[in-house]
Amino acid sequence: MADLKQLMDNEVLMAFTSYATIILAKMMFLSSATAFQRLTNKVFANPEDCAGFGKGENAKKFLRTDEKVERVRRAHLNDLENIVPFLGIGLLYSLSGPDLSTALIHFRIFVGARIYHTIAYLTPLPQPNRGLAFFVGYGVTLSMAYRLLRSRLYL
């Protein structure tokens, strides 16, 4: 079993950790952006969240949907669908001993695609911008999974 010093000396794992931190910070930004949009547009999903803006029927008018809020929320949900698999597969891939330059290409393309996807979603840019960014990031995760299965699980 590798000790902590060996793990910290693993350049691929350290690169993965750096890019994972960037992408998780971006995802946290979207969470904050959703809350910001809800507060500035006075749009809430739960009745108890409206309590500070009125009572009874008056509070219910804040219990609605808004396109700006929903757009940011959908971008955040899309991040959850893509970043979680990247984190799991990327960690296993990093520990499998891949070439540093190949791993960096995977990590950089994924992070770039996800940042571009967020820009394309929030701006909004016309399709196929968002779709291409999604599939590029998804393809990177599939590529890492394939390389991991091929090299370490002997499939």
Curated annotation (Swiss-Prot):
Domain of life: Eukaryota
Cytoplasmic topological segments: 34-62, 124-128
Residues annotated as binding glutathione: 38, 73-74, 76, 81, 121
Single GO cellular component term: mitochondrial outer membrane
Enzyme class, spelled out: transferase
Reactions mediated catalytically: RX + glutathione = an S-substituted glutathione + a halide anion + H(+)
Lumenal side: 3-9, 97-99, 149-155
Result when mutating residue 76 to Q: Decreased enzyme activity
Record's keyword terms, sorted: Acetylation, Endoplasmic reticulum, Membrane, Mitochondrion, Mitochondrion outer membrane, Nitration, Transferase, Transmembrane, Transmembrane helix
Membrane-topology annotation of the record: Multi-pass membrane protein
Compartment(s) of residence: Endoplasmic reticulum membrane; Mitochondrion outer membrane
Major subcellular site: endoplasmic reticulum
Site (Activates the enzyme when modified in vitro) residue list: 50
Tissue: Highest in the liver, followed by kidney and testis and much lower in seminal vesicles, spleen, lung and brain.
Listed transmembrane segments: 10-33, 63-96, 100-123, 129-148
Post-translational modifications: In vitro, peroxynitrite induces nitration at Tyr-93 which activates the enzyme.
PANTHER family, per the entry: MICROSOMAL GLUTATHIONE S-TRANSFERASE 1
Function text: Conjugation of reduced glutathione to a wide number of exogenous and endogenous hydrophobic electrophiles.
Protein family per UniProt: Belongs to the MAPEG family.
Quaternary context: Homotrimer; The trimer binds only one molecule of glutathione.
The protein, known as: Microsomal glutathione S-transferase 1
Species whose genome carries this gene: Rattus norvegicus (Rat)
